[in-house]
Swiss-Prot record:
Protein name: Flagellar transcriptional regulator FlhD
Record's keyword terms, sorted: Activator, Bacterial flagellum biogenesis, Cytoplasm, Disulfide bond, DNA-binding, Transcription, Transcription regulation
A Gene Ontology BP annotation from the UniProt entry: positive regulation of DNA-templated transcription
Gene3D superfamilies named among the record's database cross-references: Flagellar transcriptional activator FlhD
Amino acid sequence: MSATSEMLAEINEVNLSYLLLAQRLLREDKAMGMFRMGISEELADVLANLTLAQTVKLAASNQMLCRFRFDDHALLSSLADKGRSSAVSHAHSAILMAGQPVESLR
């Protein structure tokens, strides 16, 4: 298997894992799932209602379906600070993420 083929297979695997996790989060607690993923209600509805066949087809994209929500260097650096305790880091992360805008369908 070539390096490109291997990378595409890994992208597909990550995509499928991400979509399945997203669906599980949304089905168990829609509001919390939307918060954790930073997505709009419209996008949450689309993701939650995908059939298995649609989910697998979408996962087969050659592009990553998830992306870093931490596109601010200072934010990412503060969350990765090894000097903080895990509990403080998680609380700080939740506070910072609550201030991030949700993604919408474009």
